[in-house]
Amino acid sequence: MNHEVMNLFNPQALAQIFDSIRISIASPENILSWSYGEIKKPETINYRTFKPERDGLFCARIFGPIKDYECLCGKYKRMKYKGIICEKCGVEVTLSRVRRERMGHIELAAPVAHIWFLKSLPGRISTLLDLTLKDIERILYFESYIVTEPGLTSLKLHQLLSEEEYMLAIDKFGEDQFTAMIGAEAIYDLLAGMELDKIANDLHAELAETTSELKQKKLIKRLKIVENFLESGNKPEWMIMKTIPVIPPDLRPLVPLDGGRFATSDLNDLYRRVINRNNRLKRLIELRAPGIIVRNEKRMVQEAVDALFDNGRRGRVITGANKRPLKSLSDMLKGKQGRFRQNLLGKRVDYSGRSVIVTGPELKLHQCGLPKKMALELFKPFIYARLDAKGYSSTVKQAKKLVEKEHPEVWDILDEVIREHPVLLNRAPTLHRLGIQAFEPVLIEGKAIQLHPLVCTAFNADFDGDQMAVHVPLSLEAQLEARVLMMSTNNILHPANGAPIIVPSQDMVLGLYYLSIVSEKEPGEGMAFADMGELHHALENKVVTLHTKIKGRFKNIDKDGKEVAQLYDTTPGRLIIGELLPKNPNISFDIVNQEMTKKNLSKMIDQVYRHCGQKETVVFCDRIMQLGFSHACRAGISFGKDDMVIPESKSRLVAETEALVKEYEQQYDDGLITQGEKYNKVVDAWGKCTDRIADEMMKGIQAVKFDPKTGRQQRMNSIYMMSHSGARGSANQMRQLAGMRGLMAKPSGEIIETPIISNFKEGLTVNEYFNSTHGARKGLADTALKTANSGYLTRRLVDVAQDAIISAVDCGTIKGLTMQPIIDAGQIVASLGQRILGRTALLDILHPVSGEVIIEGGTMIEEADVLKIEEARIQSVQIRSALTCETRLGVCAKCYGRDLARGTPVNQGEAVGVIAAQSIGEPGTQLTMRTFHLGGTAQVVDSSYFESSYEGIVELRNRNVVRNSEGHLVVMGRNMAVLIKDENGKERAVHRISYGARLFVDDGDIIKRGQRIAEWDPYTRPILTEVDGYVGFEDMVDGLSVTETTDESTGITKRQVIDWRVNPRGADLKPAMIIHSDKQGKNIAKLHKGGEARYVMSVETILSVEPGSHVKAGDVIARLPMESAKTKDITGGLPRVAELFEARRPKDHAIIAEISGTVRFGRGYKNKRRIIIEPNDETLEPVEYLIPKGKLFHLQEGDKIEKGDYILDGNPAPHDILAIKGVEALASYLVNEIQEVYRLQGVLINDKHIEVIVRQMLQKVEITESGDSDYIPGDNVDRIELDEINDHLIAEGKKPASGTPILLGITKASLQTPSFISAASFQETTRVLTEAAVSGKIDTLQGLKENVIVGRLIPAGTGGTIAQIRRIATVRDDLIVDEQRKSSNDGISKAMLTDMTANAAAE
């Protein structure tokens, strides 16, 4: 009896413990073994009695009873008849829940093909049979016969015959001379007759012989599928079905609505169709109907089954009554609403509530205010239990009554229950892990949740009506995790960059900034104060103000913990802030003795966290917040319209610019500049004007003014205070309020030439207002798009990185990356210190002068170490990286370095992949969607010169310069670089200098900081002559290849090359400029490298010299306007990040030299140029490149070129970088390019996150030589798998396989994960599952996603530890059982047991 009672709660099978899941094709025997009976009728339920029809789709005899423990006819009711089968209605007396698990089946009268194996590319059936998909379809849908046994006739095996041909063949050869079949039976016979072993051997042999690449690919494809079938034990004929499984009825319910109608799942319709057609087919076969009718019916059955499995995959979509496509079995799995993403990865949870949030400034950081009503509902079970324990109620019913009536004792008990029971707060969208944090609830009146102001940044919450959800962790373990890991006090640092995220903002910043301002001539200036008591006394009595310059003593402690006091020049306000600082020898008063802008506050909190630990920081933050709020309130800072000061010089600046623009218009009218050049210049001029007005305005607002009556300094401008402190508003917004709005962009991204001269204080004119509506609307449209795109990017990133978990402490690798500071246009964008902080040094870092070890290899670089490195002026450091980590699964802690969210070395089990994905995805919504058009925006101007950011000695690498006729040094080389070295000969900086730039320094010059190195024209690309001589034109035919425009007022003629291929007469022209060595133009000058001085012109080039004129080497003979590169949009923002992560080839991608050598020109084609690189290394073959004519191309014959140099400019394709320069170059390219996009938006992300993602993109290797392995060259194999197999081969003394790393985009990489469950839940569900089933894949459940889907703890964090403990325990149990078996006497010695335990732990 006891067993029976226990079974009440767990009626069915026991939970199975499993380590992996295997998927394969279901055999007919399997389908029958699952089934509880055959469904013979299409009926569902009786419309009068609402009881299921017998043998129908809801039959109770097959699927189980409708009510618990009650048969259909009502003869047997209640528990006592459990397990009895009623003799009248045939229903088993059991729980109705079995209707969710019992399956049925349909016996088909004719076999049908499974559409997934037929149509899901590559079609498995067609590949196996070596027929085309079209042919297979013609056979299956009864259009053609296939010859299965030609006998002695002239027909060939597997030949297709149409109806007519078949009839003719029968007439010709007789019916029994050959066999030809049609329909799925034919395919079934063919598949069943395949001898896979023999076919595999034949294919191997054929592969060895064949040379054609296409044939190889085809053979490899077929061989793979054959081997898949052999390895998995699937039989090919199982792809053709003779029985169809029917899913349990409660998974496709039929619900009666009022009014006698029914709501039903689409599947029932689809199943009814199959049953109807199948029954009709059976009847026709029994009646011996004519072949054509039977064949038609068989085709209908095939189509019905197709629609059931995957509606719309073939033929037209089957629709229901309301013209809506029916949802087939495949649709149940696919997409956001499918089983995987809707129910397995995202579930709704009990014990949760949501409400509007309001601010709770009096809360502590670890608290949140929870409305009493909500708490009562959320904690009900706990309250019932406590009421029972205290004896207030004896039954749950009584407890329920007490709670409903809200008795006073209930509130006391609620207080007890809630004490120290954390709840989780979540704000949607949860973009990173700080979107869910734990707090201790504090009961409050009212209906809104109170949130602590400091955690708003993490949640990205504001109080304009945002809502948040509350969840209650129930189990003790969950509460523990919430408290220890998720409490808001543990999330002080941002996981993306390690900077504090609990930083005062808005009002708090304003209050603290106001406290820290210094004013001149305030009362009490120059007084000295001994302690804070005196100071407060003086402030109360208005002897001093908060901003007076005073001397004050600040007490701190030294290294030994003794109190020391020091005198500082400061203000009372700063001392008040200083009072709150924790006493610590490493934290000096200087950190407060400055204007407390948001940045400085962040630095201060960071310092406190690093030196004083978490607890002190939390207390400090709370106190700082209180102080900020109270002083913001007292200061009473607000602003009126008079605070927006318009600079007096505005009208003058605008007038100057207008004059300049007029001048450009005139130059354009005179034909001196092109339309595009004019546009660039105008846009530029207005850009500069806007900036100058903004500067003037800032100067005006910042200016310190004194009150003429009292002589005291006047209060600072409120708007300036808000903006400068970082509380609200930016310089840009101030510029629009009181400067000038400046240039606007059209929706296409181009900039409108006429700027908005007014500002908001003056008000806009109608035209200006109209112009500005463009931008505003585009902004709104962009925001909507951006959110969706950013979310999708995050989803792909999480998917690709989800199994990157810290799985080992140290992999012991000797590889790493070299880190250098990032310098852009002479400015240091990211210092070396920023980039290496919190990373592990690969080798010992030595002092460049003394040679002493600053940091040992294998240790983490901390803040103090960074200072040492920067003092030693080291320029590059080798560090370990996740990219070069050699751990088999996951990443090791040493290669990853510091856990940014905690500031300590990363723990084992940390899911660094997911953190990386969130850190990159979360700021995605802040990135722009726009593609920048090169319209000469203000950004282009800034990059027309280089200034030195260091002092040192200049060295020119690949020096190739000449002095032109004006006496300037001009760069003639393509890959010249200026190096700046310090006195010890160490490189400080490298600048690549573009062709045609003017150089201001030469080899060996001494250069000062800020000195110009070179400058160039940003709007044109020059073509320079390399020799002195006289100009001659070739193929420059007026009207065909050149147009001449003469300027009437000046008489200047401008020649521009036009597209000569448009006109058929000009098809053979090759416009070029030649330099003759003599004035008569008889001899062409020779270049130094051989070759003739002939310069081929591309379309749109403007000629700068007249024929016959004399030129010196280095002179410009033609120029190509940069806006001819206007097709080249600079993709910016989100699309650029996605493009990089997806590893797409850019549209006009750069061509990179694969070898070092000398350039030669080969025979060109009609519209392509052939370039050959003759290698320096004799053992290599020359490499050829084809380049479209008309592309700007700047190499000349005989130029030396290095491996990795660009032959054609553009964005390089990441695949090329990997193939030519290797993994490290690729990593640094991707990291820098992605960081650049984020840096533009001012978002800080640590490099290591991008490296983790790139590591996941580089998991696959393409086999180049198979050695003695089973691989075929061209296979894509997991890096880890290849290593393991090679280890085995080497151990056996065989030849290992070799391969080259390949780069996969994040979508591709996610779909190629070893886990099919994870891939199927990501995208292309049907394809992934088909592939997995054919190859009989086994999912070892190693990533996070697959474990969530099967409902287990994830193998990261605490879940990873639990799994490890369980593994050790299992090993230990096995050992004990074995030992007991061996020694039949039970007295197993204690020592032995401890021994075994130790061994198990080691394993």
UniProtKB/Swiss-Prot annotation:
Needed cofactors: Mg(2+); Zn(2+)
UniProt GO BP: DNA-templated transcription
Alphabetic keyword roster: DNA-directed RNA polymerase, Magnesium, Metal-binding, Nucleotidyltransferase, Transcription, Transferase, Zinc
GO cellular component: DNA-directed RNA polymerase complex
Molecular function as annotated in GO: DNA binding; DNA-directed RNA polymerase activity; magnesium ion binding; zinc ion binding
Record: residues binding Zn(2+) 2: 811, 885, 892, 895
Zinc listed as a keyword: yes
Keyword presence, Nucleotidyltransferase: yes
Enzyme Commission number(s) of this protein: 2.7.7.6
Domain of life: Bacteria
Residues reported in the UniProt entry to bind Mg(2+): 462, 464, 466
Ligand binding (Zn(2+) 1): 71, 73, 86, 89
Catalytic activity field: RNA(n) + a ribonucleoside 5'-triphosphate = RNA(n+1) + diphosphate
Cited InterPro entries: DNA-dir_RpoC_beta_prime, DNA-dir_RpoC_beta_prime_bact, RNA_pol_asu, RNA_pol_N, RNA_pol_Rpb1_1, RNA_pol_Rpb1_3, RNA_pol_Rpb1_3_sf, RNA_pol_Rpb1_4
Disulfide topology: none
Cofactor note as given: Binds 1 Mg(2+) ion per subunit. Binds 2 Zn(2+) ions per subunit.
Pfam families tied to this protein: RNA_pol_Rpb1_1 (PF04997), RNA_pol_Rpb1_2 (PF00623), RNA_pol_Rpb1_3 (PF04983), RNA_pol_Rpb1_4 (PF05000), RNA_pol_Rpb1_5 (PF04998)
Binding partners and assembly: The RNAP catalytic core consists of 2 alpha, 1 beta, 1 beta' and 1 omega subunit. When a sigma factor is associated with the core the holoenzyme is formed, which can initiate transcription.
HAMAP family: RNApol_bact_RpoC
Family (UniProt): Belongs to the RNA polymerase beta' chain family.
Biological role stated in the UniProt entry: DNA-dependent RNA polymerase catalyzes the transcription of DNA into RNA using the four ribonucleoside triphosphates as substrates.
Protein's recorded name: DNA-directed RNA polymerase subunit beta'
